[in-house]
Amino acid sequence: MSGEFVHASVLAREVVEVLRPAPGKLLLDGTLGGGGHSELLLERGARVIGLDKDPRALAAATARLARWGEAFRAVRADFRDAKNVLSALGLTGVDGTLVDLGVSSPQLDQADRGFSFSRPGPLDMRMGDEGERLEDLLRRIDERELARILREYGEEPFARPIARAVKRAVESDEALDTARLADIVAKAIPRKAWPRRIHPATRTFQALRIAVNDELGALAAWLDGLPATLNVGGRAAAISFHSLEDRMVKERFRALTQACTCPPDLPVCACGARASFAAITRKAVVASEAEVAENPRARSAKLRAVEKIR
């Protein structure tokens, strides 16, 4: 099982620098994946709780990190439920937490997961084994809602014609798999408008994956829970791979680090509020040229972090 889930952790050195793992610290890896980030934290003496809703990832990471014994604990859960997980474990907070967002390389490579358009696979796209599959989503929503998803989550300029073509195929009961869906999407986009560096279905597949897994909702819940999840002095780090995620992280972290809650048109602060968080990264940290050369997936990764100061 563990051999099926080999994943190169991005920005590994930077994550260690931000979270400062050390003996006595308890850290929460909200997106355990193959266990790469957690292993780095354990190697430096920290205790780690790893969350993942993908049973394959959980099994692989558990096998990989078994040598750490009681210092590591794996929990099958969505990182959006971090606060509830800690409560169930009898914990009031952690000294650091990390999420590495998006889909992992093993999930993309396993055709039966339905994430990739390079090989035929079922219309699934669930990161776990619960919830609505992509096929069910496409049958349930109408063309207008599908276009909205493609436009908002994929920033797809041809959302309307793509939605029309996809719904036509779904409603005709055509036998669809990921490869056929990608072909339908590509043909709905004028050939001269095809992106130069990515497959024409890339944005659509991203949008559908986000919708199936409610990824932005999960991220919002994790961000909203940080004040209750972190101990004073604890740090939160988020690695994002597209603008929607990064924008949400940036805006929420900025709000956490701002003290004054007065209306912007008030000339003098009257609330007397003090910020409970401080920025650790003034701007997004990106991968080095060397890391990108070794792991091209790291090219779009952005790391942001804050610390709870009171």
UniProtKB/Swiss-Prot annotation:
Top-level taxon in the UniProt lineage: Bacteria
Catalyzed reaction equations: cytidine(1402) in 16S rRNA + S-adenosyl-L-methionine = N(4)-methylcytidine(1402) in 16S rRNA + S-adenosyl-L-homocysteine + H(+)
Keywords per UniProt: Cytoplasm, Methyltransferase, rRNA processing, S-adenosyl-L-methionine, Transferase
Gene Ontology terms for molecular function: rRNA (cytosine-N4-)-methyltransferase activity
Record bears the keyword Cytoplasm: yes
Family indicated by similarity: Belongs to the methyltransferase superfamily. RsmH family.
UniProt protein name: Ribosomal RNA small subunit methyltransferase H
Biological source species: Anaeromyxobacter sp. (strain Fw109-5)
Gene that this polypeptide is encoded by: rsmH
